A protein has these predicted regions:
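Active-site nucleophilic cysteine motif
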Residues: 118, 130-149, 153
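Boundary regions of SH3-family modules and the immediately adjacent low-complexity/disordered segments
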Residues: 6, 10-21, 27-59, 64-71, ...
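Short alpha-helix capping/helix-loop boundary micro-motifs
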Residues: 1-3, 61-71, 161-170
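Short, basic/aromatic beta-hairpin or loop at an interaction surface
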Residues: 1, 49-63, 144-161
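Short, intrinsically disordered, charge-balanced linker/junction segments flanking boundaries
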Residues: 1-5, 213-216
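Short solvent-exposed strand/turn elements
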Residues: 28-32, 208-214
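Hydrophobic beta-strand signal
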Residues: 15, 76-82, 180, 187, ...
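...with weaker cross-activation on analogous glycine-rich loops/strands in unrelated enzymes
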Residues: 151-210
Length: 216
């Protein structure tokens, strides 16, 4: 039994290192993280055509009367899927599993508006190692934006600081400035405010930059 240090998102590729009973030890192809996944959570390899652009996209099933019925399952933001069939409102990505068309975009779509994406996660609870709608941490919040855009950045704050060559907290903040402390990272959304997954507040929250710097 161990703590969660990261999560793998639906549609991510990985390499299997070894099998242990009903589990596989894997290495995430995106950021190199090593972890474990249950056998039944592995799907056949596919070439993604689309990805989820909402915080949480509910999976629907089609009944005998051709009506779409909500299931209790969903895919998180940045999940990658291969569309098999579409109609006006829904697209099928697995056998009788459908997502709303408004929840997905083409796999090569680039979203340049960082605050727009991060605000999707507002009030999502803080969860160490989390990267999705049921909990996310500070470095996961930043990574998932770049991952959505098919751009690599490391998973952990200390490595993100090295990767972006951040040397010190600045006094002059513009939109999209990365602000870091030891073990914590936030992103400015304008000259006065930042957004971050903040442990003491237990959620993703927008706060005043100067007040936050003084508080941390």
């Amino acid at each position: 039994d161990s703590e969660i240090v990261s999560q793998i998102i639906y549609g991510e590729k990985f390499k299997i290192i070894k099998k242990i009973n009903n589990w596989f030890k894997i290495r995430n192809s995106y950021d190199g993280y090593v972890g474990y996944i249950k056998k039944e959570q592995i799907s056949d390899n596919f070439k993604p055509t689309h990805k989820v652009i909402t915080l949480k996209s509910t999976i629907f099933k089609k009944n005998k009367n051709f009506k779409y019925i909500k299931t209790n399952k969903s895919l998180p933001f940045a999940s990658k899927i291969m569309i098999l069939n579409s109609d006006k409102k829904f697209s099928k990505f697995q056998k009788n599993q459908w997502l709303k068309n408004k929840d997905i975009v083409k796999e090569n779509y680039i979203e340049k508006n960082l605050p727009k994406i991060l605000k999707l996660f507002l009030n999502t609870k803080y969860k160490w190692g989390g990267k999705i709608f049921n909990g996310i941490d500070c470095s996961g919040l930043l990574q998932v934006f770049f991952q959505f855009n098919n751009i690599f950045i490391p998973r952990d704050t200390k490595d993100q600081i090295k990767f972006f060559k951040i040397n010190e907290i600045k006094n002059n903040f513009q939109k999209n400035t990365l602000i870091f402390w030891k073990g914590h990272i936030a992103i400015s959304i304008n000259k006065q405010s930042l957004i971050h997954a903040y442990g003491p507040k237990k959620k993703v929250i927008i706060m005043n930059i100067k007040k936050t710097i003084n508080e941390i």
